[in-house]
C-alpha cells in the first residue's frame, strides 16, 4: 500500500521542513508527497538541499491550491493533530490504520505554527494523534518520520487487497456543495456561523459514515 498513501502538507512555512520531511518519508519507502499552498514556491534550493538523497521525490511533489483539490481522488483521509477536537470524527491509532483498505489514502499534516483548523480537519475520515508528554512540540519532519516509520514497520501495510471502495472525497464535496446551495436558495439560515457549523457537521457525518460507491 505504500504507493497508495499520499503525505499531504498543508500550508507549510519553511522549505527546510518540507525537504527534511521528504527525506524522512523517502527513508521509509514513501514517495507520494503533496503541498497545499506552501509559503515559498516549490521546488527551491533550500528544500531540495534538505531532502538530501531524495531529490527526485522532492522534484515531483504535487502542488495544490486547497485541501479539497488535493484529496479529490482519495477514498480515505486521515488528519494528524496533537489535541482532541470538538468534532464527531473518530480517532484512529496505528494498529487500526494498518487495517484500512482503500484505493487511495491521504494523510494531512498541518502547518508548523497552528496545525490544522477544525474546518481543515473536517475533510478527514479519521484523526491520528501521536502520544507525547506535556510539551507537544514535535517538528513537522519528526511527525512525518514517526508516521512513516509506524506505517512501514507493519507487513499489513503492504497488502494490496481492496475490501471496500469508499466514495472519493471529490464526490462527497460535490454533494455537500449541492446541498448547501439548495439550503441557501431556500433561505434555510442566513447566519454565517450557523451555515459554517452546518457544513462542518455534514462533512464530518459523511466522512465518518464510510459510504461506498454502491
Where are these regions (language model features)?
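Post-transcriptional modification and biogenesis factors for structured RNAs
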Residues: 1-214
Amino acid at each position: 500500500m505504500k504507493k497508495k498513501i499520499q503525505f499531504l502538507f498543508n500550508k507549510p512555512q519553511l522549505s527546510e521542513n518540507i525537504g527534511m520531511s521528504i527525506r524522512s518519508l523517502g527513508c521509509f519507502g514513501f514517495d507520494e508527497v503533496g503541498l497545499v499552498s506552501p509559503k515559498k514556491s516549490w521546488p527551491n534550493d533550500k528544500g531540495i538541499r534538505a531532502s538530501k538523497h531524495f531529490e527526485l521525490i522532492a522534484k515531483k511533489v504535487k502542488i495544490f491550491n486547497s485541501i479539497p483539490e488535493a484529496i479529490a481522488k482519495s477514498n480515505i483521509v486521515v488528519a494528524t493533530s496533537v489535541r482532541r477536537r470538538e468534532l464527531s470524527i473518530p480517532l484512529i491509532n496505528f494498529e487500526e490504520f494498518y487495517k484500512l483498505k482503500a484505493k487511495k489514502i491521504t494523510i494531512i499534516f498541518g502547518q508548523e505554527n497552528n496545525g490544522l483548523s477544525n474546518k481543515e480537519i473536517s475533510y478527514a475520515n479519521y484523526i491520528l494523534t501521536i502520544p507525547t508528554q506535556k510539551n507537544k512540540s514535535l517538528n513537522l519532519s519528526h511527525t512525518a518520520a514517526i508516521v512513516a516509520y509506524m506505517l512501514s514497520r507493519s507487513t499489513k501495510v503492504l497488502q494490496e487487497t481492496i475490501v471496500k471502495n469508499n466514495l472519493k472525497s471529490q464526490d462527497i464535496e460535490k454533494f455537500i456543495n449541492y446541498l448547501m446551495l439548495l439550503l441557501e436558495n431556500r433561505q434555510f439560515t442566513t447566519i454565517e456561523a450557523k451555515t459554517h457549523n452546518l457544513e462542518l457537521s455534514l462533512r464530518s457525518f459523511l466522512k465518518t459514515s464510510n459510504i461506498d460507491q454502491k
